[in-house]
């Protein structure tokens, strides 16, 4: 019985070991079990694979997820091929069970996040192919547990940077593919340039290991990077109000601001760490971008258009929207410029405030201890609900204030009583009635103020100090805040309108001890007003009530090129903050149109005139040369020389000088003459030599005359700058003739 059971057990084990899923092909070859499941349209890792399989091919399928436990039954796999799939997710622990894995191919997939911690169990890995994926980062210690890795392929991914020392632990690495990654060539990648120059690892296509950013270095190979001005961060921390000494207690109720300035290249990122009695608070300042500014500008324009529509269409008023209650003022606010705002100091905000700056080259930090005095009343009266009365920061109120008709806010004018509706005053003297609305007791208490604040309040009668906006600010369309002792007012000035922006530092004002308003009643908030007056003082031209949740106010209908002042004050009190500004001068539209038209006309006419002038110059013919033929009287000297050397005349004279041959006895005279000539030649008769020289001179003279005749037309031209050769020939002839005569005499 026992042998039968043992036999059955062996058969079962062999059957399980030899089973193979239906779409796959399993082959036992050279003591290795191959499972070929490629090109089978699989969407999951198949189950039921042989437990002793060593090579598993799942390439060219449609697998999207590698789930944890998918390879739990094939732990002896040494080669896993998963290329050309649709893998997007690799669950942590899916590959950690393959401790004997030597070759892993995950190329040509859609992996953007990989569980690098699984590689810690794959210490025998020799080949890792992760190319043609969507990897955006490679942790510094991701490959630290792969001492036998020889070939690493991470090309054609989305890697922007690599941490220094990423490849230091790969002692057996001989082949590395890094090309076609969008590297950001900043200070964090300088190490790669030095490492590539000194390593013995093969780096194929070094020219393709190039920068994608910044734009100035786009396309530059990493090994050709220029020297970059890199510096670690340095941090400077200051407080406002300033601390007289470290640990000096501050009075409760104050607004406290810490300014953190960090220098370094690249620009450091800031982080606030607050150790307060309630625990540790970590704050990250927001990052500003040009797109956000553009959206904000568009929203501002929409607000102005809505105000204009409300003022012009008073006959068909729209119902007021139900705005949500403004959020509570936050305890801490990290600003984009590196500052930290504590709107209301109390014992809960005491502690250690640390500003930490870090960039690619390191980190630095500095701290300051803030102590709050336990005694003393708060400087500003808190509002209802335990929160300070005022607006939240601009970033917190932006969504609440958007679209409100806050150019001028509703108020009860003189002669109006409860139950007769409200009036909206845009410019003093012009009112628009609105339907009667139900108001709460708090709003009724706020409306029971001066009948017309403009008649009682005059700008310039309060604090004598003024804060004048400069000309450069008025010429700009940007909001540039001016920080004062009691608050912040930001102005955006145009030709016929001005925008006033209030920020949180001017949010908690209450009536002063000597103010007209006296002490506020319980449950009533102090009323704050904005006045727009002429710069020289006098009654307000426009005014508006400062509402909670509204931080932008538009004053319209102003005169171009006029000086105005904006006064921020509490009802019945003197002006706390006053800003003097000038509206822009309005340029007539007709003048602009004429100037632009003239400029365009000149711009279009000048090239045409230049082309016409060039055409006329090209078509104008040049002045032609004229040939002038002038007859010349024959020179008697030339005639005589020609006659003297005429061979016909010499022949006739010889006929006359010598008698006929019959008379002289035949041919003897000629022989005698020839003999005489020979004798003269032998004796060197000077007269014969002179005659030969004279004949040669005459021949040369005739040749010079023939050459002069050939150039007669050129010499006689009106525009010729050459001397007539005829005159030179005459002079030479006279000289030769004179010499000849002297010799003959």
From Swiss-Prot:
Superkingdom, natural source: Eukaryota
Localization in the cell: Cell membrane
LRRNT domain: residues covered: 19-51
Residues glycosylated per entry: 52, 121, 337, 364, 474, 563
Domain Ig-like: 233-371
Transmembrane segment boundaries: 590-610
Extent of the signal sequence: 1-18
Disulfides per UniProt: 260-355
Family matches, as PROSITE patterns: IG_LIKE, LRR
Membrane topology label: Single-pass membrane protein
Pfam families in the record: LRR_8
Designated name of the protein: Immunoglobulin superfamily containing leucine-rich repeat protein 2
Protein source organism: Homo sapiens (Human)
